[in-house]
Amino acid sequence: EVGLWVGLPAAIAGFIGVTMGGRIADALRRRHVSGRIAVILFGAIAPALFIVAAFTASSAGLFFLFNVLTIASGSSALGAAAATTQDLVLPRMRGTATAIFFVGTTLLGLAIGPYMAGRISSLSGSLATGILSLLVTAPVGALVALLAWRLLPAAEARKAAWAE
């Protein structure tokens, strides 16, 4: 029964987060060359707040609510990150760029993250501590996104010059 309360809302939240994040990222990109980075920054910071709220919640209902918000806000960055990657390379390099992007996200996010959470959980005796320990990556992600915001316009200009 818990799987239904966690899994189904998580799938719906992920769908909504990716879809809305992509639409917002594209709208922001039309206004500013680094516009999509704002969505990536949101996707790095907002989930951290909701994860803390979820794992310190006083009831299962609040945990489920904050878990949905964590997934929706975190997944909002995926489309923006993939689209930014595509924008930065010439068309002939998009397959390679996508492969590298997915290797990075798969190895870092889907392999190392759960391993580290499990390892820290085993050492501390607390699953919540294991999961909350992963929040150390949020400031790093935010700093990298801010750096990307600053450097992206020059990278876009270089790509345009290469295409000529």
Stretches found by the model and what they are:
Residues 17-33, 121:
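Helix-to-loop junctions at the C-terminal end of transmembrane segments
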Residues 45-49, 135-142:
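Small-residue-rich packing faces within the transmembrane alpha-helices of Major Facilitator Superfamily
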Residues 30, 149-164:
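Intrinsic disorder in cytosolic terminal tails and internal cytosolic loops
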Residues 1-13, 129-132:
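Loop-to-transmembrane helix entry
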Residues 33-81:
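C-terminal transmembrane helical hairpin of 12-TM major facilitator-type secondary transporters
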